[in-house]
Amino acid sequence: MDCSLLRTLVRRYCAGEENWVDSRTIYVGHKEPPPGAEAYIPQRYPDNRIVSSKYTFWNFIPKNLFEQFRRIANFYFLIIFLVQLIIDTPTSPVTSGLPLFFVITVTAIKQGYEDWLRHKADNAMNQCPVHFIQHGKLVRKQSRKLRVGDIVMVKEDETFPCDLIFLSSNRADGTCHVTTASLDGESSHKTHYAVQDTKGFHTEADVDSLHATIECEQPQPDLYKFVGRINVYNDLNDPVVRPLGSENLLLRGATLKNTEKIFGVAIYTGMETKMALNYQSKSQKRSAVEKSMNTFLIVYLCILVSKALINTVLKYVWQSEPFRDEPWYNEKTESERQRNLFLRAFTDFLAFMVLFNYIIPVSMYVTVEMQKFLGSYFITWDEDMFDEEMGEGPLVNTSDLNEELGQVEYIFTDKTGTLTENNMAFKECCIEGHVYVPHVICNGQVLPDSSGIDMIDSSPGVCGREREELFFRAICLCHTVQVKDDHCGDDVDGPQKSPDAKSCVYISSSPDEVALVEGVQRLGFTYLRLKDNYMEILNRENDIERFELLEVLTFDSVRRRMSVIVKSTTGEIYLFCKGADSSIFPRVIEGKVDQVRSRVERNAVEGLRTLCVAYKRLEPEQYEDACRLLQSAKVALQDREKKLAEAYEQIEKDLVLLGATAVEDRLQEKAADTIEALQKAGIKVWVLTGDKMETASATCYACKLFRRSTQLLELTTKKLEEQSLHDVLFDLSKTVLRCSGSMTRDSFSGLSTDMHDYGLIIDGAALSLIMKPREDGSSSGNYRELFLEICRNCSAVLCCRMAPLQKAQIVKLIKFSKEHPITLAIGDGANDVSMILEAHVGIGVIGKEGRQAARNSDYAIPKFKHLKKMLLVHGHFYYIRISELVQYFFYKNVCFIFPQFLYQFFCGFSQQTLYDTAYLTLYNISFTSLPILLYSLMEQHVGIDVLKRDPTLYRDIAKNALLRWRVFIYWTFLGVFDALVFFFGAYFIFENTTVTINGQMFGNWTFGTLVFTVMVLTVTLKLALDTHYWTWINHFVIWGSLLFYIAFSLLWGGVIWPFLSYQRMYYVFISMLSSGPAWLGIILLVTVGLLPDVLKKVLCRQLWPTATERTQNIQHQDSISEFTPLASLPSWGAQGSRLLAAQCSSPSGRVVCSRWESEECPVLPLHPGLPHKARYGCCRSSLEMPT
């Protein structure tokens, strides 16, 4: 054994097999293999405890504080707080410490509570009882004590305690059914298969007698991928090696169904299970708003440093004159006079930093997080986005990208299952040029369709009849369909009846396969079932044919085909293969290729999904060679997928073409309307699909991506066969630039309205040539730039024959182009996950191809039509709200701090604060925080119906329109202007002591309180003026926050607080309000402060209105006209009356406008004076108007 171990080490590290460290070896039942067997290096594995919590009782405080102070804003305010503690600063440490303490405490309580819930869930899971096999008997232990190598028994409706290799079940065929709803959301039953050599072990003693080792890959989070092999030792013979795949793996979290019990061996436990590995979140995506917010913070940080530096310099300039540095009432001590000048200057600089630090809003981060978290529920609560048929509603997997939904410039969408229903219906099949459709049967004979007779001029004959039946057998055998037989039931141990063809219900992860099997059933051949590795079909003579299933060459999106190897009762071995025409035709050496290709292209143009079917007969020697090739690839632990692909390539060649099938996939409801609305919103839509060009092109026309006026440009393999890639790209570039002229960012993002209507079609092979390096070793960047130049001048792009990674390449190419547009990817299948993860926003459609797309997406919706409301309504609102929140926070903090800066010029730069400590502390926490939070949750600047009806409003917020530098500078200067009004208005009004009742001048605290009062009123009323959508909650919060400020000030200044060391605010607020000039000053200053913003909005709405502002004006006029008496409406002019009569003439003298269904309703011409709402009346209900 030692020599064997040494040999293993030498081979592993000296013979180039170092990659083997990526695998693990497991002794089943902890039994070592017999003497002489291969030795393995023992490894240490974790126990089966699941720990999803982040903290423990001991490390919660230090770890949570460390995580929170990793955020730059929190760390910044911590530094400010420490500076206030260390040096003599003008403000109390409470002013910075209390807000920081509040933010840290709220976050810690929230995270602590969430972690406590995780602890409870972990304990319940770890203490769950599990049945082990130990010395041939069942032993019950807690789940956390399970170890790798233990043999476990799981009963029906129990959850698997760890990741298990399926050894056996009570079923004779060695299968079991599981549901994985807790893992991927799929509630359908999935079939898993036991190891071939262990499926007969039905008792504890049988399983305990097993001697085997399992070699498998190290843990990785992909739920649908697993590579391993099992070595079963029988006596002293060489071990039997069997491959292990995902069909043999039972995942922790899945539930056993319709199976009494199973036995399995633990291979991944605890935090190494796939379920635990999927706890880790996806890579963090950052929205454009968040990036802008961080940029603005840096700007304000620079302003803060500049203010502190200017005041420090001016302080020493001012103190340079005699007696200013040391007045008679504040003489310095000897030690103070001898202090280093630079040290004093640095200390003063820090003190000014503390004084002005409130320009950085500490509460903005908390408010933004609350707004995103609470706002995300508006999507999940939206009843319009709930699908009754599926019983599913939208899902929000992250709330960090809500506002990004309002910034999308490119949409990349899958076709099958996203634009289409993925509900396949068999239409026809073509066998050697003859076309067959269901139900065309006469006297038991299948007749060719009349539309296909002209393709050949003779009947099939005897040879054709054989090929015809061989074609139907190929369809019945080449698939992975399961049969749910109502007569057979689930009890396989009892007597079985022969299944009735009419009672068969087919189940498959691929709707295409179900449609094909059901289609040939209507043509006379019925697939019955797979039993004991034999496939049974019922032919048109009602005889049951049995074929032994020898091998399955599974489908993958790269090969685009699948095959089966079967053996008939007469001993003949066949390989049946079906797949895409581009995948089958190059491997065909015999058959009527031209006739079949012609029919395939015709069906593709009609939008049908096509597959080609071929076969070849294998000699026993050929089958043995194929078996050895497949077995070698299947048991490989390294590069198994690559080796299998090479083996498939060797086997699937020299085929005989049988024919082709056509399946219809209907377009989803309102898919065309959704794409049309998105294009009107200025969003470019690209379709990325694996289908052939003709099929995808027909779908694009059906969904209005391409129109009759669209000039299609092709960049396909067929085109490249005629010209070089360089020539094709330059020709296309000249074509699109001939009418487009110079390119702008608007043309790139699809927002240009004068773009020529070009459509581009590119296939996967052409994209590979564009993306790969040049033959001369130079970069292919120039090809990419040419390609992007063509794409940015096309209104729509179709990418066909795309592999999953190519979809992600396309998204990445556009995402990182020089314009950096915001991208969105939407799909429903596992092949769409790569592009969903690559795009700025990923949306999964909850479809029929599983939940992988929905699980890996940022948002999930039931149907493609729901994308319209998600972007045009929710995305629009989210962006408007969050951008206003960010700008408003900076604005109100400029208003807050700039008077403090101005005050230093009147107090000798002594760092005297203008506001009381309580006001400094509560300004951002209590007085001004709730109104903007409610605004950012509930604001609707235009109605929901208007946004859905007019998609062009989406253009007004495109390209981060509300957070550009121009808008940011406007808000900043507005804050500076208001601060100047507050400070100097109060200063000049109360500079003359005659305006007060008793002739005394206001003190600095009364002056500061007056400025603060005007400021709170102005910033709150500014928000009220910006509010378009009022509810009782808005009224309560806005006016309630003002009343709270007044009540607090009365209480704070009306009581002598014994715990305070000072009483400087006593009677200040009451004294201020008792002065008539103070009331006059408040009213005047608030009015002047709001005036510029009001004037700007009035002038812009009248002179340079945006589309949104025009819509708001129309809505305002409509609301007024609802109360206008009918007699006051403008009369119809003669010209308008004649026009109306001409348009509305009909034989009955009436015009009837019916309810809108699927086509555009003609809009009746109305007099300009009529209310705007009347324009849409005919679309809502039947309307009759006399001529």
Swiss-Prot record:
Changing Q84E: Mutant mice surviving beyond the perinatal period show a reduction in brain size, dilated lateral ventricles and neurologic deficits. Increased sphingomyelin levels in various regions of mutant embryos. Disruption phenotype: Conditional knockout in afferent spiral ganglion neurons leads to age-progressive hearing dysfunction characterized by abnormal auditory brainstem responses and normal otoacoustic emissions. Outer and middle ear function is normal. Proteolytically cleaved by CASP3. It is an enzyme of class 7 (translocase). The chain crosses the membrane at residues 62-82, 89-110, 297-318, 350-372, 885-905, 918-937, 968-989, 1004-1026, 1033-1053, 1072-1096. It comes from the Eukaryota. Its main location: membrane. It holds the Pfam family PhoLip_ATPase_C. The record marks D457, S458, D493, G494 as: Cleavage. It is a multi-pass membrane protein. Its cofactor is Mg(2+). Belongs to the cation transport ATPase (P-type) (TC 3.A.3) family. Type IV subfamily. This is Phospholipid-transporting ATPase IH. The gene is Atp11a.
